[in-house]
Amino acid sequence: PLKNMVLSRDCIWLSAGYCVAIRGAEMWRKQNGTNPYPVVLGVRSSVFLPYKQLGLVIVDEEHESSYKQKEPAPRYNGRDAAIMLGKMSGAKILLGSATPSFESYQNALSGKYGFVQLTTRYGEVMMPELLFVDMKEYRRKKMMKGSFTPVLYEEMKRVLENGMQVILFQNRRGYSTYLQCDRCGSILKCKHCDVSMTYYRYRNTLNCHYCGSLRAVPAMCQECGQGHYVNRTPGTERIEEDVKQYFPEARVARMDLDVMSNKAKFRALIDDFESGNLDVLIGTQMVSKGLDFERVKLVGVMDADSLMGFPDFRAEERAYDMLMQVSGRSGRKGERGKVVIQLTDMQSRVYQLVRKENYREFYTQLSQEREMFNYPPFSRLILVELRHMDGVVLRNAANELARLLRERLERRVCGPAEPDVSRVRKMYRIQILIKAEQGLSLSKLKAFL
């Protein structure tokens, strides 16, 4: 679309696999030659290609956590690398987002960045109507239709009868995110990782999303030997089954990493949905990323609570971002759309602020807490992670390292503490967090470490 609208010369689109595995060397030679591509559309690794006359760097959806590469090394933030590339090249830099990261928003408010705010939606279309639905009441009254509250069910029925389309968002893959014994309550976990295994009904297996191990579903509970495992917390596969059960005439497709194994499948699904060959699209966060379908008049968030509760100071920011982004898929053209958000914690401040659709107020409230506890954007964080197959050895080493760090860095050191998933691929993990306030020399700190 970009090439058709504004370009008269060649451009190249780079995915991670295309750039790195297949054509990396060829692209490098092309960009270093006398006739480089004038426009490169790429993932985060594209910032490391050579550019001779770079004039503009655009980072779309700059708030996205996927710009960070955590594993394997080198670990970097693609957005920050793009900003540095632009500065080194003397190019203009444009960061775009409806829900900017706190770091970028702080830079804009302080005058470090220029700030352009769009106060109306493209085409002057009204923002969708948000409906927050308390699942607790409907579950208590046994009024749920599978994964759907009566409110979402009726809205889906109305939209589908009018020949329009629906997007359902559930940020969990598989049929069930974990299996639990109906007698003793134990949860079936991976043998190599400290995490529950996801159940896939279509192949009747359990899969660990951390190490990739597979196992069959045991006939009886592995702990008490008497109970049976039951499904808990539905994933996209279960949502797809529910849609087919309650809306048998609807044409349904699923968009997640389990079915979108390559670019061709992704493109084919998008084309089918855009052309009206599908009625309901179910997906994980993939459905929230910049998709533009004019016939989508309803977005359903199946379980908003699953976006919260993570031991991460950015958890509320990411939940807000995700809800606002996925809500933006509804009613992008023509009549106003609707968004039905199913949840149980109706008092959460994140949901109250999403209802107001006021990012400035959201930022103000959370940034006050971050400043109080010295978190970004008011500090820089260094995460030190230690791993070992022996948990006792690891704990002793982590305690000693933390003691040595505190001798120099004092209260800047937090931990050691176990992360949410404390064991991956048979390796135990412990983390130490260092908070470096504004003005502290990071080069000296890194040299000390």
Question: Which role does the model predict for each range below?
Answer:
Residues E371-P376, P419-R425:
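Short, flexible, solvent-exposed loop/turn segments with mixed acidic/basic and small polar residues
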Residues A397-R403, L442-L449:
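Short amphipathic alpha-helices in soluble, non-transmembrane regions
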Residues L409-P419:
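Short beta-strand elements
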Residues P1-P38, G42-R395, R403, Q431-I432, ...:
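Inter-lobe coupling/hinge segments of SF2-like helicase ATPases
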